[in-house]
A protein has these predicted regions:
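Residues marking helix boundaries in flexible regions
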Residues: 9-12, 386
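Bacterial N-terminal signal peptides that target proteins for export
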Residues: 1-7
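Hydrophobic h-region of N-terminal signal peptides that target proteins for export
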Residues: 11-19
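Mature catalytic domains of secreted/periplasmic carbohydrate-active enzymes
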Residues: 21-430, 434-452, 456-458
Length: 459
C-alpha cells in the first residue's frame, strides 16, 4: 500500500497473508486517544515536600503541611501555559497522608494547619483545573506506610477502596485518568509497628474488583496500570524514553515485573491487548520538590526532544510537576514549561505542501480496527528516506537536513490485514531549532526560546 498526502492509493506491493484480528481500543480509551490530551502532568506535593523525601515513612507530622502561599491556579496555570492538557493529582502517596478530608484515616489534611484544618488540597486543584479548562485526574497510592491495616483484607476493602470511592464520587467531578502504580509494600510505620510487610499477588484486587468499581463510578475514566484490564501502560522507565518502533499492543501481564519491564517499552505485534504507552518522567531530578535539586529542571529543548520520543512514538507524555514548600511552582519550572510549548509549537507552525522543503513528518494510522502497520517506508521522489515498523496513533520524524522532494508517500510494506488508512503531514521548521532539539541532553542548560516565540507569547 502507498499513501499520499490526503489520499490513500492501494496498489499491490506485497501478497499479505491473512492474520488474526488485532486488539482494538475500548470505548473510553478510543475517545481519549481521539480527543487527547497527548501531554499530561502528574503533581507531587504533600508532606514529602516538607520532609525533603521522595518516600515518606508514614509517621510524619501533619503539622508540617503549612505552605505560606499555596496557589492552585498558579500551579495549574503554569502547566496549561506549558501545553499540558490534563493533570493527575497525587491525593495520597506511599506515606499514607491523605490530602483531602477522608473518613478512612485520621492521617489526613484536616489534622494540618492548611486552611485552618478545613482545607481540601484535592478540591482546590480540581477546581483550578476546571477554571483553566484542562482535565483532572487522581493518583491514590495503594501502598500505605501509615495504616496499621496494610497487608490485611480490611485495608483493601475499608481503607483503599473506600478512599477511591471518596475521590471518584465525592464531589470532584469527572476524572479523566486514575493512576495505579506498582507500589507493593515494604518497610513502614504501619500504625507504630515499624516493620516490613509483604503482600501477595492480586492483593489490591485490581482485575477482580477495583478496576470495575472505578469504571462504575467514572464511566469515562482511563486507567493507568500494567494489568491487562487497564488502558495505559508504563513505558518501562522514568526518563520519558520510548522505543522508535513501540506498539500500543502488548502481551498478557503475568505478574512478574522483571519479565514485563523488558517489553513494556516496545510492545508486541501479536499482543493480546490494546494498551498504549504513557511515558512519565519528573520535570526536575526528583518527583517531589527538593531545594538541593535547584538547577536540575529539564530544559525547554530537552522537553521538546522528549515530546518527540514519547508523543512522536504513539505515547502520551506525562511530566512530573513538583510545587515547592510555599505551594507554588518554582520560576525555573514555569519558564521551562512555557519554553517547551514555544519550541514544540514552532516545530509544527509551518505546514507545507509536497514540492516544498520539509524537515518534519507526522504520520497517523486509523486505529479504529486496531494497530495494523507492521513495516513502512517514507518515500521521497522514489527514495526511502525514513523506515520503521509501527505507526499507530502518531509517529513523528524529524530530518536533520531539509528535503525538497516533489512527491512523497508512505509505503506500507506489511500490515495486519485490515488496514484502515494512513495519513501524513509535512512541516518546515527552522533548521537551527531542529539542531537545538535533536542535540539536547539532560545536562542542557536553560534554553533561550525568544527567537521562536509568537507575537502572543512574547507579550
Amino acid at each position: 500500500m502507498k499513501v499520499r498526502l490526503g489520499t490513500i492509493i492501494v496498489i499491490a506491493v506485497l501478497a499479505l497473508e491473512a492474520s488474526a484480528a488485532r486488539p482494538i481500543p475500548r470505548p473510553a480509551l478510543a475517545a481519549r486517544l481521539a480527543e487527547g490530551p497527548e501531554i499530561i502532568g502528574i503533581v507531587h506535593w504533600g508532606l514529602n515536600t516538607f520532609t525533603d523525601r521522595e518516600w515518606g515513612f508514614g509517621n510524619e507530622d501533619p503539622a508540617m503541611l503549612n505552605p505560606a502561599k499555596f496557589d492552585a491556579d498558579q500551579i495549574v496555570g503554569a502547566c496549561k501555559a506549558g501545553g499540558i492538557g490534563g493533570l493527575v493529582v497525587v491525593a495520597k502517596h506511599h506515606d499514607g497522608f491523605c490530602l483531602w478530608p477522608t473518613k478512612t484515616t485520621e492521617h489526613n489534611i484536616t489534622k494540618s494547619p492548611f486552611r485552618g484544618g478545613k482545607g481540601d488540597y484535592v478540591k482546590e486543584m480540581e477546581q483550578a483545573c476546571r477554571r483553566a479548562g484542562i482535565k483532572f485526574g487522581v493518583y491514590c497510592s495503594p501502598w500505605d506506610r501509615n495504616s496499621a491495616h496494610y497487608g490485611t483484607e480490611k485495608y483493601v476493602t475499608d481503607v483503599f477502596q473506600q478512599q477511591l470511592r471518596e475521590l471518584l464520587s465525592g464531589g470532584y467531578g469527572e476524572i479523566f485518568e486514575m493512576w495505579f502504580d506498582g507500589a507493593n509494600g515494604g518497610d513502614g510505620y504501619y500504625g507504630g509497628a515499624r516493620e516490613k510487610r509483604k503482600i501477595p499477588g492480586g492483593y489490591y484486587r485490581y482485575d477482580t474488583e477495583t478496576f470495575a468499581m472505578v469504571r462504575k463510578l467514572q464511566p469515562n475514566v482511563c486507567i493507568f496500570n500494567e494489568m491487562d484490564e487497564a488502558d495505559f501502560r508504563f513505558c518501562g522507565n522514568e526518563q520519558g524514553l520510548v522505543d522508535p518502533d513501540s506498539r500500543s499492543t502488548i502481551g498478557h501481564y503475568d505478574g512478574v515485573w522483571d519479565h514485563y519491564k523488558h517489553v513494556a517499552n516496545v510492545g508486541a505485534v501479536d499482543g493480546t491487548t490494546f494498551h498504549p504507552i504513557e511515558s512519565d518522567f519528573p520535570l526536575r531530578k526528583g518527583w517531589f520538590y527538593h531545594e538541593s535539586e535547584r538547577g536540575t529542571t529539564r530544559s525547554a529543548a530537552y522537553l521538546t526532544k522528549l515530546y518527540l520520543s514519547s508523543v512522536g512514538n504513539a505515547s502520551t507524555m506525562n511530566i512530573g510537576i513538583a510545587p515547592n514548600k510555599d505551594g507554588l511552582l518554582d520560576a525555573d519550572d514555569v519558564k521551562a514549561l512555557s519554553g517547551f510549548k514555544t519550541l514544540k509549537d514552532a516545530l509544527f507552525a509551518h505546514e507545507v505542501k509536497q514540492g516544498e522543503p520539509f524537515n518534519v513528518v507526522v504520520m497517523r494510522e486509523d486505529i479504529s480496527k486496531g494497530e495494523q502497520v507492521d513495516e513502512w517506508e517514507f518515500v521521497a521522489d522514489g527514495k526511502a528516506i525514513l523506515r520503521g515498523k509501527s505507526i499507530g496513533l502518531k509517529r513523528i520524524r524529524v530530518l536533520e537536513t531539509p528535503c525538497a522532494a516533489k512527491s512523497c508517500e508512505v509505503k506500507v510494506l506489511k500490515d495486519g490485514g485490515t488496514l484502515q488508512g494512513v495519513s501524513f503531514r509535512l512541516y518546515r521548521a527552522d533548521p537551527e531549532l531542529v539542531r537545538l532539539v535533536l542535540s539536547a541532553t539532560t545536562e542542557s542548560g536553560e534554553t533561550d526560546t525568544a527567537k521562536w516565540m509568537t507575537a502572543e507569547q512574547s507579550k
